[in-house]
Amino acid sequence: MLRRITLPVFLTYLAFAAQSVDANPIRYVAIGDSYTVATGIEEKDSWPSQLTQKLKSAGIEINLIEILGMRGATSQQTLNEVMPLLKNLEPEFVTLLIGVNDWIREGISSSKFKIRIKSLIDKIQNNLPSSRKLLLITIPDFSCSPKKKIGAMVKALLMELLD
């Protein structure tokens, strides 16, 4: 797990490298599904908590103020139910990991998912003081799991999103 968060930590560190040492801690909100809310494990072991601890150990003053996520959430549910809560939290940094349930539960097309994810990104960036303070975490690669069929769909989606 540690290797998997090294790149996000590095990228996040670069985004905040110019932050003054005596500045107020960065207000961080994590948005997502069961991966984000740490279903089945303690919150301190969730990836948002681990990312926060890694950034703190790198000298970045940051506080994870809220994990806005739901078990089984799709991108549409996140748009409808989670996004209205974001504005009042006044985040300065947001991570987004969503999409697995779109594929598993809904089986949506990549074009429909692309529309939803772009809408989520726009809404998040509109609630941030700097649109560069959003870290988008991709859907996990299922190619090494029993759900290999989903892995092929995810890979195709990611390639389309990168276009």
For every predicted segment, state its role.
Residues 72-81:
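Structural motif
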Residues 69-71, 138:
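Residues at the C-termini of beta-strands that transition into short coil/loop
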Residues 61, 80-163:
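Alpha-helical cap/lid subdomain in secreted, periplasmic
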Residues 35-42, 71-72, 102-111:
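Second-shell loop/turn segments in exported
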Residues 8-17:
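Bacterial N-terminal signal peptides
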Residues 1-9:
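Bacterial N-terminal signal peptides that target proteins for export
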